[in-house]
Amino acid sequence: MTEATTTAAPVETPLPEATLQPDTGEESFHEHEARTMALTSHETAFMAELAPHAGATPRRGLRFVNVYRLIRTSLPLHEHETLVGGEGEQTAYRALLTQLAIVTGAPAIAPVYFDHLAALAAGNLAEAREYKGLADLIAALGEDDRVTASTEAAPLLGALQILRDSVAPQGLGNDPALLATLHNTASVARRYSFTARPH
């Protein structure tokens, strides 16, 4: 007599725990990096305007772009709205990009620029103050022999003029608030300067 053979029912193998982890709703590092490195059209347009003043060589131009991307990636996502704004209306990204263009395209006289900026910003906070803005900063630099005698005067003053033109429709061409924004973002730009790093 032949015994009947029985086949055991297949046992379902559970998936590895790694694939069963709950969705926390949090971005991974790579997702965060991808989102923060994606520049807005407002940023790329302003960078294109500044590019001729950010250095006479492709290498300097590439450094200008890459440094800004690096800074942007280091920011939490919630700070991007403050940096750029939904319509590109914020001045912080323009102030930062302008100063990155200066340290890249006019490294020899960048320290002179930062000295003038600090002096005017401090004057705006003094008790007996006469408010100064970007137009005053440009004028002061244009009267400084260290600037006018330098071959880097054109990229320095050119970058600042582009910033001034960009904020003119908002009525900020000589607003002390813009000078304060330049001063507040100056330390970030100076970290990536070979000649004007903060002490």
What feature does the model see in each segment?
Residues 1-199:
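The feature marks long, low-complexity, polar/acidic/proline-rich intrinsically disordered regions embedded
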